[in-house]
């Protein structure tokens, strides 16, 4: 398994973050090209951990798993233990692409009655729903879905990883204990998510004197280090069947949430076939449902295939118009 390529996609569930842009990077980023491989994520400290794993003899999946857990420390909006995602893994020797679905799932108790406090036998009229009523589906404990990230990353490691799980996660545990300097990105993510103050624990972690942690502040996450340490030893069971799950469910129930232990013990990520299309003599693979992005991507490529893009400069108005369409 020397040649291995993968793509991960993470989504958030425990804390919904506004989709509006809140970051204005002061300098443009340009494409980077490498010959022997690279690790790319939304935080350089997490990418550095991926490089560390590769230098220890790990493969791409080992590195991706380490990066996925590290992002829970460095930039939780990009990856965290409370969300879910999708992964594509390409095994060159087999010429095969694997799709892992670890999307977060709605709690078993999630229904209109429990979410909106409706009477079970009451006739539901869509006109009765006001926009502000849907805030409970965007923020807080009722907006939370059963997390799939831990299951998905560990399933990927079990199937394709090379190094022992403890070796993969040890640099992440060290990072959480030693702390990281708050980045501009993380600071802005906290600043644009004031609802984090509504929960005492998230307020304790991400705020200082009632203000978002400032840039370059040393943020340590010893509790998260303990959680990841338990996972490194006990695997999926440590998260979905142990005291970690108990604490999440208790916190949910104490805050009018919908989680039950069965949501955690019954959760499983799954391997599925990716979807694909032909684009200019290339076969493009991507994640299928429940991911909506894959279908959108392949549809866009099929539309673009009818246009001769070589006729236009890469930075021309026509090129940008076609791409944006």
Language model: regions and residue ranges:
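Bacterial Sec-dependent N-terminal signal peptides
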Residues: 1-20
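Noncatalytic scaffold domains of N-terminal-nucleophile
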Residues: 19-48, 52, 60-61, 65-234, ...
């Amino acid at each position: 398994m020397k040649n291995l390529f993968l793509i991960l996609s993470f989504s958030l569930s425990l804390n919904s973050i506004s989709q509006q842009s809140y970051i204005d990077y002061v300098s443009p980023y340009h494409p980077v090209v490498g010959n022997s491989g690279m690790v790319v994520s939304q935080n350089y400290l997490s990418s550095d951990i991926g490089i560390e794993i590769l230098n220890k003899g790990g493969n791409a999946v080992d590195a991706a798993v380490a990066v996925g857990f590290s992002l829970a420390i460095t930039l939780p909006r990009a990856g965290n233990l409370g969300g879910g995602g999708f992964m594509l893994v390409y095994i060159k020797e087999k010429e095969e692409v694997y799709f892992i679905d670890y999307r977060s799932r709605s709690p078993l108790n999630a229904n209109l009655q429990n979410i909106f406090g409706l009477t079970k036998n009451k006739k539901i009229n869509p006109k009765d729903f006001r926009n502000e009523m849907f805030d409970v589906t965007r923020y807080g404990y009722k907006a939370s879905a059963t997390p799939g990230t831990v299951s998905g990353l560990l399933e990927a490691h079990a199937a394709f990883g090379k190094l022992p799980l403890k070796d993969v996660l040890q640099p992440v545990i060290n990072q959480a204990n030693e702390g990281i300097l708050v980045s501009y990105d993380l600071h802005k993510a906290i600043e644009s998510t004031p609802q984090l103050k509504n929960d005492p624990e998230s307020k304790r972690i991400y705020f200082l004197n009632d203000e978002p942690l400032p840039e370059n502040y040393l943020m340590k996450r010893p509790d998260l280090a303990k959680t990841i340490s338990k996972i490194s030893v006990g695997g999926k069971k440590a998260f979905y069947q142990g005291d970690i799950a108990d604490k999440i469910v208790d916190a949910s129930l104490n805050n009018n949430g919908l989680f039950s232990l069965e949501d955690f013990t019954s959760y499983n990520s799954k391997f599925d076939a990716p979807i694909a299309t032909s684009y200019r003599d290339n076969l493009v693979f991507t994640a299928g449902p429940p991911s909506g992005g894959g279908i959108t991507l392949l549809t866009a490529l099929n539309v673009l295939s009818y246009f001769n893009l070589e006729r236009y400069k890469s930075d021309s108005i026509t090129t940008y118009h076609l791409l944006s369409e």
